[in-house]
Curated annotation (Swiss-Prot):
Negatively regulates transcription of bacterial ribonucleotide reductase nrd genes and operons by binding to NrdR-boxes. One of its GO terms (molecular function) is zinc ion binding. GO terms for biological process: negative regulation of DNA-templated transcription. Belongs to the NrdR family. PROSITE patterns: ATP_CONE. Keywords: ATP-binding, DNA-binding, Metal-binding, Nucleotide-binding, Repressor, Transcription, Transcription regulation, Zinc, Zinc-finger. Residues 49-139 form the ATP-cone domain. This is Transcriptional repressor NrdR. It comes from Shewanella oneidensis (strain ATCC 700550 / JCM 31522 / CIP 106686 / LMG 19005 / NCIMB 14063 / MR-1). A zinc finger (unnamed) spans 3-34. The gene is nrdR.
């Protein structure tokens, strides 16, 4: 690793610790030439699978789109930003764990509904009504009845 102060190519690791629940390594380094110390963070580069849309087109996974959908569903509901971040993290972890290069958008929608169901029932109904394109009140009733079981 190059020293950010003098650009020397030789640095030594003084201390290493796991951070971010074990998903990153924090390293304290010292330059062997100028003796300045600096911190680096190391983490695995995890590639998200591509998304196969309902019409068959493929596009890169868009984390912002996932977050926007969840935020819209939980809008004005008693759900903390921490809970939202955890739910989004679970969805992304599940997608990575499939080991697939491509996943259908339907899978992402179903994962989103699972997370919303455990977070907030009203948010779940909001998302499901748009995602499943409810046409009339009876479809809302069926979704609510499913929640009450």
């Amino acid at each position: 690793m190059h020293c950010p102060f003098c650009s020397a190519t030789d640095t030594k690791v003084i201390d290493s610790r796991l951070v971010a629940e074990g998903h990153q390594v924090r390293r304290r380094r010292e330059c062997t030439e100028c003796h300045e110390r600096f911190t680096t963070f190391e983490g695995a580069e995890l590639v998200m699978p591509r998304v196969i849309k309902r019409d068959g087109t493929r596009q890169p996974f868009d984390e912002e789109k996932l977050q926007a959908g969840m935020l819209r569903a939980v809008e004005k509901r008693p759900v903390s930003m921490d809970e939202i971040e955890q739910a989004l993290s679970k969805i992304k972890s599940t997608l990575r764990a499939t080991g697939e290069r491509e996943v259908p958008s339907e899978m992402i929608g179903n994962l989103m509904m699972e997370q919303l169901m455990s977070l907030d029932k009203v948010a779940y109904i909001r998302f499901a009504s748009v995602y499943r394109a409810f046409e009339d009140v009876s479809e809302f009733g069926e979704a609510i009845a499913k929640l009450q079981k």
